[in-house]
Amino acid sequence: MQSNTFLTPRIIDVQNISPLHARITMEPFERGYGHTLGNALRRILLSSMPGFAPTEVQISGVVHEYSALDGVQEDVVDILLNLKGIVLKLHNRTEALLTLSKKGEGTVTAGDIEGGHDVEIINPDHVVAHLTSGGKLDMQIKVEMGRGYVPGTVRQLAHESRAIGSILLDASFSPVRRVSYAVESARVEQRTDLDKLVMDIETNGVVDPEEAIRYAAKVLVEQLSVFADLKGTPLPVEQPKLPQIDPVLLRPVDDLELTVRSANCLKAENIYYIGDLIQRTETELLKTPNLGRKSLNEIKEVLASRGLTLGMKLESWPPSNLDKGKKDTSHAAP
């Protein structure tokens, strides 16, 4: 199908308001495409961007989240809330086990976390806890890569065998803090009914706004390519099972070795196979021209010798591959 040429954006302006905040303007779009693409990109940015978050923690001396630690101003619940606010990024791996150990009076921050050269703490000044004189805080923090928001109660089902004292955290993986879009009017030459799309994106520093919208656009293109190609894996279609038919019924009536008279009478009634014959009743056969009681008795005796009778019912007769037009006249009377 041929279609008219659609306008594509020729002007893309990126205004960096801050390292974490950008306003991206794209124009022109055909009328209505601003809302169509803006809403799709916004939903992908908010729900499908990969990021990193603390998912599990073990604190020395803590058995459950409602415990309290001597020498620490915050209770465990507050410490866990502060851990969720840590923004970090792993390079070349998808999960890591980090350690945080500090003692003595002072403030514990995200910058005190140790995890190796491939762990980048985006907000090292983020406060985790405050220690008083003689206070001590030791913990291990598991960080994982993921998408969206995953409550700890959901992850708990898959961690039934976790160690005593291990606390699962609600994980917010999305590196995008806020996304909004607006559609304004655009003009190209004499056309004034076009759209200008303005997207306002703010991230937490794991990705910059430009990288985020590129990733979202890539996801959208990959998803829509399925519709463009109409390719995929079709659902398996279960083939209907053909009913089993006794091979004897598929044999021609000539195999019954009837007299020539009886055989010709049957063929005159389009009875070519044994399966055709056993479905006829005695009354029906006696109506056949030139077939009398003697021939009928002969047919009944031959069928009985094979464990068959007249008047039987076959639900799946005739089979689709049966040649009903087959006629064998080798025994026909001259």
Swiss-Prot record:
UniProt keyword list: DNA-directed RNA polymerase, Nucleotidyltransferase, Transcription, Transferase
UniProt cross-references to InterPro entries, sorted A to Z: DNA-dir_RNA_pol_insert (IPR011262), DNA-dir_RNA_pol_RpoA/D/Rpb3 (IPR011263), DNA-dir_RpoA (IPR011773), RBP11-like (IPR036603), RNAP_asu_C (IPR011260), RNApol_insert_sf (IPR036643)
Gene Ontology MF annotations: DNA binding; DNA-directed RNA polymerase activity; protein dimerization activity
Enzyme class: transferase
Region named Alpha N-terminal domain (alpha-NTD): 1-231
Reaction(s) this enzyme catalyzes, per UniProt: RNA(n) + a ribonucleoside 5'-triphosphate = RNA(n+1) + diphosphate
Gene name of the record: rpoA
Summary of the function given for this chain in its UniProt record: DNA-dependent RNA polymerase catalyzes the transcription of DNA into RNA using the four ribonucleoside triphosphates as substrates.
Transmembrane segments: none
Annotated protein name in UniProt: DNA-directed RNA polymerase subunit alpha
Protein family: Belongs to the RNA polymerase alpha chain family.
Gene Ontology cellular component list: cytoplasm; DNA-directed RNA polymerase complex
Record-level GO BP terms: DNA-templated transcription
The keyword Oxidoreductase is assigned to this record: no
Domain notes: The N-terminal domain is essential for RNAP assembly and basal transcription, whereas the C-terminal domain is involved in interaction with transcriptional regulators and with upstream promoter elements.
Annotated spans, Alpha C-terminal domain (alpha-CTD): 245-334
Subunit note: Homodimer. The RNAP catalytic core consists of 2 alpha, 1 beta, 1 beta' and 1 omega subunit. When a sigma factor is associated with the core the holoenzyme is formed, which can initiate transcription.
The enzyme's E.C. designation: 2.7.7.6
Organism, scientific name: Nitrosospira multiformis (strain ATCC 25196 / NCIMB 11849 / C 71)
Pfam family, one: RNA_pol_L
Domain of life: Bacteria
UniProt cross-references to HAMAP family, sorted A to Z: RNApol_bact_RpoA
